[in-house]
Regions:
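Collagenous Gly-X-Y triple-helix signature in extracellular proteins
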Residues: 1-115
């Protein structure tokens, strides 16, 4: 699988805890990235406000499709899913998508779904 995956450059707050510090938004090369808060929702609620200057909402979500993710072993049960965006006002929190598809954040030591 890795042999056919293509690298993609993503911009995110890769420092955290700096509120809305623009210089904290840097690039990384990923092969299977988590989406950012802005790429899901097209708005910023918790992430560093400078992230959105380098991102766009995915067309799939912009078209109004559901942001809800489901458990692989209980496909009728919704699961919260991590975003790659850090919560700008915290050192230990990341953004996530709630079970109803809305934006939220939670402590990084919690277990939530991963949905690239």
């Amino acid at each position: 699988l890795r042999a056919v995956m293509k690298p993609i450059t993503k911009y995110s707050d890769n420092t955290g805890g700096g509120n809305n510090t623009a210089s904290y938004v840097t690039s990384t090369t990923d092969y299977l990235p988590l989406l950012s808060e802005f790429e899901y929702h097209g708005t910023r609620t918790y992430a560093n406000s400078a992230e959105q200057n380098f991102q766009q909402q995915y067309a799939y979500y912009q078209a109004g499709n559901s942001k809800v993710h489901y458990k692989h072993n209980a496909t009728g049960t919704a699961a919260s899913a991590w975003c790659r965006s850090v919560f700008a006002s915290s050192t230990y929190y990341f953004c996530l998508v709630n079970t109803d598809g809305s934006a939220n954040n939670n402590n990084a030591n919690n277990s939530w779904a991963l949905a690239p």
